[in-house]
Amino acid sequence: MNFPLLPVMITDSITDLTPELLQEKGIRLLMLDFDNTIVPYTTSVPTEQMAAWLEWMLSSDVQLCVVSNSRNDRVKIFCKRLGLDCITHAKKPFSKGIRQCLDRYGLKPAECALVGDQIFTDTLGANCAGVRSILVTAIDNHNIWLKLRHVAEKPFIFMARKRRIYFEES
């Protein structure tokens, strides 16, 4: 069993993920963290690159669902505008929102992955739910708390890389 704070996969950006690569790994559903994974905390507008990636992924056989801890309506508005399914109030690292997503899609954890920028919420929640965890670099560290959290996560990223846990090898 892997240590629950180590991501199963690591990549720089969510846009590095392709439908072909995910399907090759047996992933039928990609759960997406919202803040700092798709857009910064300070906006609800995706970059052109992110909007194009989301459109490309939505046209593929890999299903997408935003699973966010946010209670803010901006997540629902964003998802509705782009045609994305979403679950808010997910309570990561607890598995409530992740399990709700699995139930909604009728899939087994092994058929799913969750991509996010935080080890202590996204990675831990995914691993504890049996879903593959994909860690991406945060889009923005706009305040001191985010910077401190990412500093606290560095040893786990180092351990994951030392164990050669990269996306290509998972």
Where are these regions (language model features)?
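Asp-based, Mg2+/Mn2+-dependent phosphohydrolase catalytic module
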Residues: N2-L32, V39, T43-S44, E48-L114, ...
